[in-house]
Amino acid sequence: MTAPPTNPLALIAELTHRCPLHCVYCSNPLELTARSTELPTETWSSVFQQAAALGVLQADFTGGEPLARPDILDLIKSARAAGLYVNLITSGLPLDEQKLTQLVESGLDHIQLSFQGADADTAEEISGTKSHAQKLRALEWLKKVRVAVTLNFVIHRRNIDQIDEMLKIAESSSAARIEFANVQYYGWGFANRDSLLPTRAQLDESLIKIKAAEERLRGKIRIESVVPDYYAKYPKPCMGGWGRKLMLITPSGEALPCHAAKIIPGLQFANVKDQPLAEIWHSSDAFQKFRGESWMQAPCNTCDRRTIDFAGCRCQALLLAGDAAATDPVCTLSPNRPKIDVVLAAINSSTPEI
């Protein structure tokens, strides 16, 4: 058994898979959890208490759309009572000004508002819902309450040319942080990859604009940018490394090391309804599976980067190499890197439609 290097720092509370949006890159599984199997309020409250005792500092409320939970105010209160910093990741569609005030009064520390584009047409094309005007209204309401704000712009081929317009939206808001996060290609993102992955020219131009904005807004707005894995030389340490920093609880209570872990065949996931959180973190089969280095194959097992990127994303290795224990194929040292290069060659020579 490989002991975790630390206790988890954050708990990702996936409260529900229900969502008013139908984004073509959604990271939720292709088979969603039914409302009838969602954890009740009291179970989540117990999870928050156990998480705090385990050393968790922050609870990230996500989904789906976490505001679809009628008990969202009670959940925020429970997490705050446990001593956790509470972050809400939302589409903003279920919000109104009164609801926002109630969320903050219940103890909400931070809100991340997602945007699918810089204009209504792009947002509707991607999400399948008329949502953009509501998000802009939410930005105005956020100016009136004391809560930290991050704007999440999910970047892909269809909106990457709108970076300047996205920055204008952010600069007119109360946000202290912007995240330009390129789509991660698993779940629905993988299914629609050929229509979403930007071209090299698009990516390079966007990075120039983001770099200039970082300099111009330094000290005012913090900007973070996550580039597509496919264009990287080395893989990122997915989730900070398998079972190292984060723990995700699904709507039905399964504990996962990462969002997409359920696609890996043969893994059995413990449920918070049946086992204590600490036991799951320290000794459950799923969290043990790719923790440490003993499972690594060549070239990772002798590579100097094995303690930096931990062989990359296990789910990406499965999707592209057919083996969850393989080197992440985005790595230039991976024997499967040519598969990535074939995808990039096609992307950079065509204009596919969603």
Language-model region placement:
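Flexible mid-to-C-terminal extensions adjoining Fe-S/redox cofactors in radical SAM and related proteins
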Residues: 3-4, 29, 262-354
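Short, P/G- and charge-enriched loop/turn segments at secondary-structure junctions
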Residues: 1-2, 232-236, 289
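Conserved alpha-helical substructure of the radical SAM core
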Residues: 1-110
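Radical SAM enzyme [4Fe-4S]-AdoMet core and its adjacent flexible, acidic
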Residues: 34, 85, 101, 105-110, ...
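Short strand-loop junctions, especially beta-strand C-caps/beta-turns
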Residues: 29, 64, 154-156, 318
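Residue-level signal for the nucleotide or nucleotide-sugar donor/cofactor binding architecture
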Residues: 39, 70, 130, 158-161, ...
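Flexible loop residues that form catalytic
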Residues: 31, 64, 116, 183, ...
